[in-house]
Amino acid sequence: MSKIFRYECRRLLLSKFFFGLAAVTCFYGWQVLEHVTILGIAHTASFSPWSFGDYLSRLLPLLWLGTLFSVSVYTNGAERRAAMLTQAAPMHPAVYRLARFLCVLTASALLSLAAVFTAVCFYARMFRWHDWGTLVLPALVTLAPALLFAAGGGWLIGYMRVWLLVPWALFPFLSAALPLPEALGLWNGKLFSTRPLLLPSLDPAFSLSPETIVMQCALALAGAGLFFWAALKK
């Protein structure tokens, strides 16, 4: 499986389109940092975990699109026809599907790291701030569940009909426009601008409500479940 994974990663990550996505992510991220994040969020510093989380929530739709691009590489018509060859190979087809799904997650993680690295460079340049450890938790809880959900759902519907990835790509944009409850506030970024005002201290540490934690865990599990459902159907 490791050989399949390395081969598929090279095929996906060394494509011109992936490098283009990474460049667009860094450029758009810098614009958000320079024009929005620098103002601070909910009376917190521009480099606070709350402001950083708001920055990531604004980049989430773009990272979602990047994840679905990776999914489309393995669910388009040509790949599905080529799957007939892998089904005749001695290795179980589920191994190929799992290796490719891990490649999708790897690509999504690298795009997310590009967004995080852009913020790290911005904070170091503008504020001489280097306490990067405080950014790990908001990055994980904001991006990991959502992108796993994007990949799992995209894998399922992409194998059903690849064009269904287009409406699935609109999901984060729709979520950003809706008045969601606090448990889903990470999707539209409202949690980062409202929750600090509800906490007692002036510069509160990053924290989430139990409802939000449960919802993010449910999204991550749903993403994994959707992939395995699609794998079993094949």
Cite the ranges covered by each PLM segment.
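Transmembrane alpha-helical segments in integral membrane proteins
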Residues: 65-83, 154-162, 218-234
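Secretory targeting signals
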Residues: 23, 27-73, 98-168
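Aromatic- and glycine-rich beta-strand/loop motifs that create alpha-glucan
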Residues: 1-24
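N-terminal hydrophobic signal/anchor transmembrane helix of membrane proteins
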Residues: 82, 104, 108-117, 212-226
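Interfacial transmembrane-helix starts/ends
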Residues: 5, 9, 13, 93-105
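Terminal transmembrane helical anchor/hairpin motif
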Residues: 34-50, 168-234
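Short helix-to-coil transition segments within interhelical loops
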Residues: 85-94
